[in-house]
Amino acid sequence: MRRAPIVYLIFMVLAAITAQGQHLVLVHPTVEYQDGSQPLATAEPRFSWNYQADVRDVRQTSYRIIVASTEEKARDNVGDLWDSQTTPSDRMLLIPYQGKALGSRDQAYWKVITTVTYRPDADVTSATGVLDTTIESKINYFEISLLGSDDWYAQWIGFNYDDDSLVQKTRIAARYLRKEFLLRDEIREARLYISGLGQYSAFLNGTEVAPQEIFKPALSDYHKRVYFNAYDVTRLLQKGDNAIGVILAGGRFMAMRYNASEGDWCGLNHTRHFGAPRLILQLEVTYQDGTTERIVSNESWQITNLGPIRTANEFDGETYDGRMDLGDWTTAGYTDYRWQRASSAYPPEGPLTAQPNPNICIQDTLKPIALFRKGDRWILDMGQNMVGYLEMSALGLREGDTVTLRFAETLNPDSSLFLDNLRSAEVTDRIIRGATNVHSKTERYKDAVTTWHPTFVYHGFRYVEITGLRTEPKPHHFRGLVFYDQMATTGRFETSDEILNAVHRNAYWGIRGNYRSMPTDCPQRDERMGWTGDRTTGNYGESYLFGNQRLYAKWLTDIEDSQWANGALSDVCPNYWRRYTDNMTWPGAFITVADMLHTRYGDEQAIRAHYPAMKRWMMHMKRHYLVDGILNRDCYGDWCMPPESLELVHAQDPARITRAAVISTPFYCYLSDKMAQFADLLSLPDDAAFFRNEIQVVTQAYNERYLDKKTGRYDNNTVTANLLPLAFGMVPKKMEEKVLANIIDKTENEFGGHVSTGVIGIQQLMRTLTEHGRGDLALKIATNDTYPSWGYMVRNGATTIWELWNGNTADPSMNSGNHVMLLGDLILWDYEYLGGIRALEPGYRRILLKPHPFAGLESVNCAYESVSGLIESSWSCKDGLFEWDFTIPANTTADVWIPTANGHEVKTYGSGQHHITSKIGTWRFWK
């Protein structure tokens, strides 16, 4: 959408103060943590900003938010929509709008004026006086999307074709829809509101709308809600004749695996099916004289499925037949006499909902590192297991030639593609060369270039097998286009240890590759689902790497949309598979993600919105499964525990298996503690007391049942059995040392200082060891490069994170090369314990800086771009001398734990850049 022109007061250029080389700038003004480029899905927006400064001890003392109906009024400080007046406050995150009621299509201009104090002197201990100044932001713009069903005048349209194949691996041709229309006058502005199910690409007068965005709109349970997008298309329209065109593909609206005779859509052979592709579109044009006109989807539109995209199944790939190219079908004057009239289509059950999160965008490009021939085919190596698609330029193809691209994460020993771990996914793209309008069909074909990439599918791959070429390809003929949900990279982490660095890099690639308008488990095989348990703890670490708040806030809606009337939640959200297993661990992400959004971004809204559904789920689990203080309900166990034999997927040895109640009962206490905190936040004292009483009663029953008070062992003494109650505060204080000793003994002596847990245990292992004084063991686990460890993956060529610790030897039936669930709390530990960056207050208004300089690690360079500003922590330790540079954002403070020879010293620091040197001798790890 459009933004207001950048306007500054003459005496406040860049909203900064500048004196003797010092400056203080108000930056990142956002509404709902958005920059105004996307219409808002709410009429109750919240305003945020932060600062950049090279002065110290910056404190905001007041703010004034002005919201106006025009840019001129905002410039003149006339807040005809809302003027907060000068408000004494240091608040700068998510301040709610409290002005005149806003509604669909409303546009507003806003700015903020703040007063701040700061200390200009570079010496933090100096007595130099505190100065104050006023800072004014640039004028910003926001717009409200369509919020109600009565805003829509369009109808759903489509067409059911007899040649659609809806058996098992569904095959349908893309739908092409078009409409020509006349605009009678010059245009002031125009908005396009559109939803195409399952996926769409839209064009106006031959130009694609938002070409950088793909896989639109965001995924959802279409029985609960259907997202639509909104665009400013003013520049794409003209007075006179115009044309609009839309391509539709099945996406997730049409099941990738389907059998109409099966009622249960659970598993690899049957995903959820909602129907054939359909479109709703509303183009609203405002003329220069202020009058308006709407162009809407209805039965006057033309449609065909005889275009070049013949199939587009997310699991199996896309086939593009250039011989069926439709020419300039998105421009006015096109002859469409062979097309059909579109039919009215049944609306999806879910209401149209303004999409709250950005779409997926291309955000990186890779060049191949190798290209070699194998028989009659070519093998391309991208050098990185990536998620996206391949763009190809081929020379000399003739009409009817077929180029086939197959994708894989790894190679067999003979350099052929290893495809066994893809299950039924065909992951094959095909392009058939059409007639050329550049050269005649003679010898000059060899000079013709065919450039192509798919539109509606993606792949998880490092290697590509290419067949059907007539000329020898070159590496520069190919590009890997990397895409994921649009978001900023917010974390930076580097150490003196190559394994830690490589694993962090692999995590970065794996996490972003599994953002597909939901956090997925994997990007390559016939699954690609939003498994909740993969993110129960992982979401906390991911949110250091990426500004993913809008993706995760949207995913919480997906989770609540999966809820049954009895309170049960699906393990997969959106619930394209029917996975209602009633266990505490996987759906627990519903609660932990909301906690993360509050902690990391200062956002209470997710807790307020979803608390009733969270409570229904907790009550459902208590009502059906909590007996005598024990909740004996778990489906997956300590998933992917390192097995005793390298060819196994799951451990068979009873000594490695943690029983259900020993997992689910501690998790019930853990989540009850989160719920009690939420109840405190929401001023629900009865709920808070209830959940805290649950913890007390269940903890007592659990310890009586499973804790051996002589040995300090829980149940069968697996690391996870002992770890969970210790991590969740359930172990009696006098028993903590014994329980910890059992964890250490198992990890060091039976596992040789390697990973000793599965998915559930690894979510708590690194932090718990460190909190109890054995961070040295955590570091050993993190830096090992032999099995089982993250470093073992690196040493065996992984460039992402495997699904299994033994991913290079295990049965390929469940052996993804790009899963993030095994990361557990590693990334969280990297930033919060090695880097030492933690939030003491939501949104990092107060910060804890507490790095852990373990022996064997010489340096850590860590940074996090929080919503309150940039936090940096970079330290080195050599010959007993600890040197530390850290940055505290403006308008925040930090409790700083300084390592000393005898332990630590704690000081409170204001904002700015600081340097500390401390002699710590040989003492190198601490709590």
Give short role names for the model-derived ranges.
Residues 19-21:
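Boundary at the C-terminal end of the N-terminal hydrophobic targeting segment
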Residues 199, 296-305, 463, 472-506, ...:
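Active-site acid/base region of carbohydrate-active enzymes
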Residues 271, 275-282, 293-328, 333, ...:
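Non-catalytic C-terminal accessory modules of carbohydrate-active enzymes
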Residues 244, 320, 526-527, 545, ...:
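C-terminal capping/lid segments that line or modulate ligand- or cofactor-binding pockets
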Residues 190, 194, 204, 389-409, ...:
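Alpha-helical support elements that line or immediately flank enzyme active sites
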Residues 1-7:
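Bacterial N-terminal signal peptides that target proteins for export
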